[in-house]
Swiss-Prot record:
The keyword DNA-binding does not apply. One of its GO terms (cellular component) is plasma membrane. It comes from Pasteurella multocida (strain Pm70). This is ATP synthase subunit alpha. It comes from the Bacteria. F-type ATPases have 2 components, CF(1) - the catalytic core - and CF(0) - the membrane proton channel. CF(1) has five subunits: alpha(3), beta(3), gamma(1), delta(1), epsilon(1). CF(0) has three main subunits: a(1), b(2) and c(9-12). The alpha and beta chains form an alternating ring which encloses part of the gamma chain. CF(1) is attached to CF(0) by a central stalk formed by the gamma and epsilon chains, while a peripheral stalk is formed by the delta and b chains. ATP binds at G169, D170, R171, Q172, T173, G174, K175, T176. It is found in: Cell inner membrane. It catalyses: ATP + H2O + 4 H(+)(in) = ADP + phosphate + 5 H(+)(out). Pfam families: ATP-synt_ab, ATP-synt_ab_C, ATP-synt_ab_N. The gene is atpA. It is a peripheral membrane protein.
Amino acid sequence: MQLNSTEISELIKKRIAQFDVVSEARNTGTIVSVSDGIIRIHGLSEVMQGEMIALPGNRYAMALNLERDSVGAVVMGPYADLAEGMEVQCTGRILEVPVGRGLLGRVVNTLGEPIDGKGEIENDGFSPVEVIAPGVIDRKSVDQPVQTGYKAVDSMVPIGRGQRELIIGDRQTGKTALAIDAIINQRDSGIKCIYVAIGQKASTIANVVRKLEEHSALQNTIVVVASASESAALQYLAPYSGCAMGEYFRDRGEDALIIYDDLSKQAVAYRQISLLLRRPPGREAFPGDVFYLHSRLLERASRVNEEYVERFTNGEVKGKTGSLTALPIIETQAGDVSAFVPTNVISITDGQIFLESNLFNSGIRPAVNPGISVSRVGGSAQTKVIKKLAGGIRTALAQYRELAAFAQFASDLDDATRKQLSHGQKVTELLKQKQYSPLSVAQQALVLFAVEFGYLEEVDLDRIGSFESALLEYANHNYADFMRELTQSGNYNDEIKESLKGILDSFKANSAW
């Protein structure tokens, strides 16, 4: 068979015309060094700050340092098998985590992957971990309460929906216990909860999850875990991941509560990353932007107005406000609240609950120090009945503390001083509360009414605990409807005052506690 040159030429032209050229421009680079979870990459000329970089083995790193001829990135996950010369590439994306109702009741890692062995999670989409906080115009003032179930907190340092209230204290003073009880108390309130565990032992986190399950609170909670065995990068990013999951509910006109346990360990993880990236250290070897690390996180906790929710949901949700309430936890060393990170977070938040080791060790639990614990915006959100009845509590305790200090040196005290000291001791005793036993609004109101109107004067100090438990049992058994209505309404008027007085008078007449 003989082919002439014309046919060959036509055939080649035809094949060339049919050839489909698919070209893909990729921005690739090469690893030049690996050390302690930090990789330096040469060649990624178009990488962005915070961009995800694809590594071999379906892993990612986050670009944090953009230098003249190299990129410093932190590896998210194991890095032992990474070596110099390996090729990496840009993804053009920043870190996103799954969000949605499918996460409720689940335990996930920083990247939103399930680690509880309950199968895949059905998420409603993905959200970037770094989001700009809502602006001033999009916000609404805090005027609805978050009940923790603790008498000492709800009466003296009330928390509102959309507030940032710091829980601060030394190790082993009951900070996590207070936060977990606050989550348990939201079982029937409709508030979704997110618990972010940063740098804790896996056994401690497992215990928290078990307790939430035992008290039927886990189905309403997302647990985000970056344990002590995880890399510094995952511990640093965990609060932002949890916040993105909480914002899903806030932006759809619902209420959410997020616990960061604790931000001291996140700051240490960020310090580790910064020093490995050779950023200049500042006070206590923290980098210069450690304030911004926490401020950009905590500013995302807010109460947003109806227009914001309507705009975000494209008109699907109308006339509803959303809120994300944050309870960050900070661990102090020997009660030093003037250290770098504690002062930073105190200045960012709307108040703090200071837990003191001396009070804790003397059996006063929760160990709230009423002198320096404050809620800057929670007063306007406090339930009316609690606000009305709790007015004298803080004053009584402050006067008691002052008098108690002087009474140690005084040999003879007048009757008025003795009476004030006795009253202060009884109030202190009454504010004690066991873990996992939150009180409803009506129960708290009844106890505070007893304090306010002198029903404790005839009760001996060592009988205060049994007096309270017997009173609450009596009220729940005989006045269940009234207690339920008072919890739901939270109002206070002459009729309610008479009803509370009637319960206490009836209890005193009939009960042998």
